[in-house]
């Protein structure tokens, strides 16, 4: 459903605007806005790729000035364990959520 703010993360858990999202044992990030989403349904699995903005503070999202870079959630494969992990990137071409 492209009108929904619901998407599943790499573990199959719902990621929603207004929810808190953790990266390992790090401080939680709050999903504050979805910029765009491309929903694909393949073999019964729903995948949504798009741009999301996250904040350390749910009530006052960060503003981006010309001296600051936008940060995005991305998925990468850990070299030691081979597991897919979630991380932050400032490269908009590497956004995978």
Swiss-Prot record:
GO terms for molecular function: serine-type endopeptidase inhibitor activity. InterPro entries: Prot_inh_Kunz-lg. Keywords: Protease inhibitor, Serine protease inhibitor. Exhibits Kunitz trypsin protease inhibitor activity. Belongs to the protease inhibitor I3 (leguminous Kunitz-type inhibitor) family. This is Kunitz-type trypsin inhibitor 1. It comes from Selenicereus costaricensis (Red-fleshed dragon fruit).
